[in-house]
A protein has these predicted regions:
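Key DNA-contact positions within bacterial/archaeal DNA-binding proteins
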Residues: 21, 28
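N-terminal helix-turn-helix DNA-binding core of bacterial DNA-binding proteins
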Residues: 1-19, 45-47, 52, 87
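Amphipathic alpha-helical dimerization/coiled-coil segments
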Residues: 55-113, 129-177, 198-216
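Conserved catalytic core of two-component sensor histidine kinases
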Residues: 24-25, 98
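Basic, amphipathic "hinge/linker" alpha-helix immediately C-terminal to the N-terminal HTH DNA-binding motif
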Residues: 6, 39-64, 119-122, 187
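Beta-hairpin "wing" of winged helix-turn-helix
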Residues: 31-41, 45-48, 113-114, 175-176
């Protein structure tokens, strides 16, 4: 759910490696507390985080939680992919997310201390129409502590719009499972041109040259 998706209880139980009844009990408590929202689609029920603030709280808790042991190559590869680049609710996180936020600060587009917007032109080069944002109740920008980097990445409406733009431009593509996203060759060139980010030198981020089916 940290990826901003709505999922059935069966999928959540499988991911947590618990029974469906146990998962349903936990989901009920989270729903009652207002942390999770239930969406009904016909006879089916899907569950998602209530909003970005819940996702941010989970990221902050994960940043201080002890690391989980890795027991297989598959788990290791998945953990590496998530550390490199992933979605945090609806914005970009991981090593790449932090690098993008820092590059935007270096360019004067964001205030380094608060990540507040300073110059919208740099976002236009990323495909974000800043003038169309900031009309709702959601904060335009928000600093979100990255659990894997222990440094902030950009959240808020602007952070969400930026991730959407990078996906729409095919600079990033979603992995078929989980929250990980991959940088395409086009994205590596674009990030270097606009923000001066050398993706090839940004371990553990790697340029994925394998054609990937875009996942909604």
């Amino acid at each position: 759910m940290l990826g901003g998706r709505s999922l059935p209880a069966t999928d959540l139980a499988r991911a947590a490696q618990i029974s469906r009844s146990t998962a349903s009990a936990h989901i009920a408590q989270l729903t009652t507390s207002g942390l999770v929202v239930v969406e009904r689609r016909g006879r089916h029920r899907f569950h998602r985080l209530a909003d970005e603030r819940v996702a941010e709280a989970i990221e902050r808790l994960a940043a201080i939680a002890p690391a989980q042991p890795v027991r297989s190559l598959q788990e290791s590869n998945r953990a590496t992919a998530h550390r490199a680049a992933r979605s945090c609710y609806d914005h970009l996180a991981g090593t790449l997310g932090v690098a993008v936020a820092e590059a935007l600060c270096e360019a004067g587009a964001l205030d380094r201390a608060s990540l507040e917007l300073r110059a919208p032109d740099r976002f236009a080069a990323l495909g974000v129409e800043v003038d169309a944002l900031g009309r709702g109740r959601r904060p335009l920008t928000r600093s979100c502590l990255d659990w894997s980097e222990r440094r902030p990445h950009l959240a808020g409406e602007l952070g969400a719009a930026m991730l959407t733009a990078l996906l729409d431009r095919a600079w990033l593509v979603r992995r078929p499972a989980g929250r990980a996203v991959a940088v395409t060759p086009r994205g590596a060139a674009g990030l270097d041109d606009v923000l001066g980010i050398d993706v090839a030198a940004l371990a553990p981020v790697a340029i994925d040259r394998t054609p990937l089916r875009r996942v909604a």
